[in-house]
Amino acid sequence: MLASVNSCSLPRDRSMTDRFQLVSPYSPAGDQPAAIDKLVANFEAGLAKQTLLGVTGSGKTYTIANVVQQVQKPTLVMAPNKTLAAQLYGEFKSFFPHNAVEYFVSYYDYYQPEAYVPSSDTFIEKDSSINEHIEQMRLSATKTLLSRRDSLVVATVSAIYGLGAPEDYLSLRLILSIGEHIDQRQLIRHLTDLQYTRNEFELTRGAFRVRGEVLDVFPAESDTEALRIELFDGDIEQLTLFDPLTGETLRKLQRYTVYPKTHYATTRERTLSAVDTIKEELKERLEQLYSQNKLVEAQRLAQRTQFDLEMMAEVGFCNGIENYSRHLTGKAPGEPPPTLFDYLPPDALLVIDESHVTIPQIGAMYKGDRSRKETLVEFGFRLPSALDNRPLRFEEWEARSPRSIYVSATPGPYELRESAGEVTELVVRPTGLIDPVVEIRPVGTQVDDLMSEIHERIKLGDRVLVTTLTKRMAENLTEYLGEHGIRVRYLHSDIDTVERVEIIRDLRLGKFDVLVGINLLREGLDMPEVSLVAILDADKEGFLRSTGSLIQTIGRAARNLRGKAILYADKMTRSMQAAIDESDRRREKQVEYNLEHGITPESVERPISDIMEGAREDAAEKKSGKGRSKSRQVAEETPDYRAMKPAEIAGKLKSLEQKMYQHAKDLEFEAAAQIRDQIQKLKTASLA
């Protein structure tokens, strides 16, 4: 019953291919064929690090997809934020529809870490809101990495934070085969060891029910399929996957593996062993505190830790159990925690997207976490072992990283140094588009000049991005443009990820024409409708006006045939000069290629879809943190029901009705009423 920890023995889903199959109507063009060949050759030659310098709109994601198909290795793609991760996830899913493309980001919609402020003697308890849909996708990602070779996981910096040890995760899994003799009580006990809960009334994710000799299990990593185990006289007679909502049989299986409900599941023996080592550490720490005459801290630590120990001994769990992860994983003091990188096979491929942002992020995570926890330990809120519940240090991440490709339009000094000159360029776009024309205009008349440019673009049906230096200036400019009849929105840091995506989508749909922001309009987001980027106060040297920032911001207009960037400045800074020189170099190469091959540039046409689809869940379905409304909606969806086919409408109606009844059952009547109104709109549209 207990499986060995050799991942090679894991069952594979025989209905799926084990090889990457790229599906795309396009063929590599422009600089792409040479870039793909070079990246693949370097990877197969064993080169540890290389860089792909790709301008905006050059098809970096498509190039990487071709590399993945040719090298045929499990792949981890890291992005700097959830928005870009969701966009990449959608793109890779469309490129590899027959393979296992997964999404691994933080499952917290809201997270307030445990903290202590000595100056005011204030202790802040941990509070969080967990997105169950993303939790399910994280579990699916680790299962895929352990069981399939055709796995591609898109992740954020969450990948360097602690997970349960893969050895425990593997040793606990339950492998079932038809004909196997198994005691029903033993089977139920094993499911509870995996932290599944028994629920005879409703089969929910991470639960099971028993009806005679039939057990139904809803795997924690699945959102659409549940497993039915039919026993006869102690033998497994049949294994069936079925729809947990309708009960419809999907397919019969010869073999199935049930994985733990959480990454932090561990054996009873390991938990009891951890309790003993925690007691030893507590004794040593109390002696230190008493010797320093810190009586209040000692009493506080003893009380909090004893309560946690009692909970762990009785139920195998306690709030904040992650602070004891070093004891639960059997690691030595100072050893790095297990992370997603421990689930990767040694021959995997790592792709760091927007590496000039992601690499510094990885380096910064450890220090911020350490500072907060040192205060908790010093004042007796946590044992010193809590310091080992942490993200990887940068050098630890480097040691665990497999062969890597850094992807960026503006690679940083680290990537260039690590690549040792192996930089592959993607400068020529398949569409023939050339980099935007860059103009410099005086600051004194920047607002009036900008308004006239905006009116010109609106006449053409295009969109405009404006980037300012301060929040106050962005607010004032938005108000001023609005007073002059321009449809404008302001994108600021208080807007959460999902609503940001909705705002950018509304810009592309033409619900407004101008988007004003500060530092939120740089990397990665595809907006082909944008033909003008205006950078105010471009001559104020600093982080927001560095060479890399300017190149990235100018690149937002690179997907449009009429693309233009205006830098408002009274003097030429070094950053401006470097950005303009690089832009001119790229334009020269692009124009030369187009003339040589007789290519006429054309704007990118990209369907306007919800890039968070599949990587989001209605806010009302999320677990709520203390004092946080469960039914808060971050952005209301406005689908075009008229464009839907009758079969799609029927499916949508069924889905909405299920959600409405669930909200009513949970006494969330406002959310239920909103969905009822959506159902009415959909029925009206279908009859029209």
Curated annotation (Swiss-Prot):
- Residue spans of biased composition, Basic and acidic residues class: 633-645
- The UniProt record gives the binding positions of ATP as G54, V55, T56, G57, S58, G59, K60, T61
| Classification via Pfam families | Helicase_C, ResIII, UVR, UvrB, UvrB_inter
The ranges of region (Disordered) come to 616-646
Residue positions of motif Beta-hairpin:
107-130
- Superkingdom field: Bacteria
Family, per entry: Belongs to the UvrB family.
Q: What does the entry's free-text domain comment contain?
A: The beta-hairpin motif is involved in DNA binding.
Q: What is this protein called?
A: UvrABC system protein B
Give the organism the record lists. Answer: Xanthomonas oryzae pv. oryzae (strain KACC10331 / KXO85)
Supply the gene name: uvrB
